[in-house]
From Swiss-Prot:
Protein name per Swiss-Prot or TrEMBL: Malonyl-[acyl-carrier protein] O-methyltransferase
Keyword Glycosyltransferase set for record: no
NCBIfam families: BioC
Lineage of the organism: Bacteria, Pseudomonadati, Pseudomonadota, Betaproteobacteria, Nitrosomonadales
InterPro entries: BioC (IPR011814), Malonyl-ACP_OMT (IPR050602), Methyltransf_11 (IPR013216), SAM-dependent_MTases_sf (IPR029063)
Gene3D superfamilies (UniProt xref): Vaccinia Virus protein VP39
UniProt key word Methyltransferase: yes
């Protein structure tokens, strides 16, 4: 097995365990969500049915429900603990009046239990980096969207946690961090999946910490610690831990340890099909008979 393949069972358990305290540590996730919502202001769309893929504790889904009060929001997450926490944090009036408009679904983004051409919009904030087959995932998201439906997402790029990655070099031979796809490769994947007019951009966001434990504790608190097949199964030895601390300390700036995230944003549309089910080309014409 590839050491960088994500162990979905371990990931599901990690996120479920982290659910209760997730929001207190999910600073990056909330900030990126707000930036995605700002981007959404420039897009003219009134979805009747949308999917929040990788909904977590539901904070982003609640923002979408407020923005599109008439829409049904499907909150999908692989971790049942996240969905349970999301339900417990909905306000009383949402539970009383909005329950029929928000539908929780426990499933994997890579295998959606949704009908083809059934959604007007797919929204995914920092979730698709947990997919093992990203090209196939985009094909799946394309499948469930209606024609002229919108895919809007954020994910992490290869420079994410570059300081921690550098600090782990020379410590041992284990796989300590997940690998992330390059923005340009993701754009190519969207086109190959059948999407049109993909727009990609990225930015670096840096969180700062007092010590290495703070970095690792935050990752664990949001369920984002290493769940690859090649991860170590036991605790890190004292010597290895000491080397990690020494390596990371060399990166301290202005009294703080940085943790950089390369945040990648993307959106694309599902165009009208060019051929019908029989493979014949679809040619649209526009003329008037006088």
């Amino acid at each position: 097995m590839n050491e960088f393949v994500i162990d979905k069972k371990a990931m599901r358990q990690a996120f479920s365990r982290a659910a209760e305290g997730y929001d207190a540590s999910a600073v990056l996730q909330r900030e990126v969500c707000m930036r995605m919502l700002e981007r959404l202001e420039y897009i003219k769309l009134q979805p009747a049915r949308l999917l929040d893929a990788g909904s977590g504790t539901g904070w982003g889904g609640r923002q979408l429900a407020e923005k599109y009060p008439a829409a049904q929001v499907i909150s999908l997450d692989i971790a049942i603990g996240m969905l349970q926490t999301s339900k417990s944090r909905s306000s009383w009036w949402q539970k009383l009046f909005g329950g029929c408009r928000q539908l929780p679904v426990c499933a994997d983004v890579e295998a959606l239990p949704l009908a083809a051409n059934s959604l007007d919009m797919v929204w995914s904030n920092l979730a698709v980096q947990w997919c093992n087959d990203l090209p196939a995932t985009f094909v799946e998201l394309h499948r469930v969207l209606k024609t002229e439906g919108l895919l809007m997402f954020s994910t992490l790029g290869p420079d994410t946690l570059k300081e921690l990655r550098q600090a782990f070099k020379g410590v041992d031979e284990r796989s300590h961090l997940n690998r992330f796809a390059d923005m340009h490769d993701i754009g190519d994947m969207l086109v190959q999946a059948g999407f049109a007019e993909p727009v990609m951009d990225m930015e670096y966001l840096t969180l700062t910490y007092e010590d290495v434990r703070g970095v690792l504790q935050d990752l664990k608190a949001i369920g984002a610690h290493n769940t690859t097949a090649g991860r170590g199964q036991g605790l890190m030895g004292k010597a290895a831990w000491a080397r990690l601390l020494e390596n990371y300390e060399k990166l301290r700036r202005d009294g703080k340890l940085p943790a950089t995230y390369e945040v990648v944003y993307g959106h694309a549309w599902k165009p009208a099909p060019r051929v019908n089910r029989d493979g014949a080309a679809i040619i649209k014409t526009s003329f008037k008979i006088k």
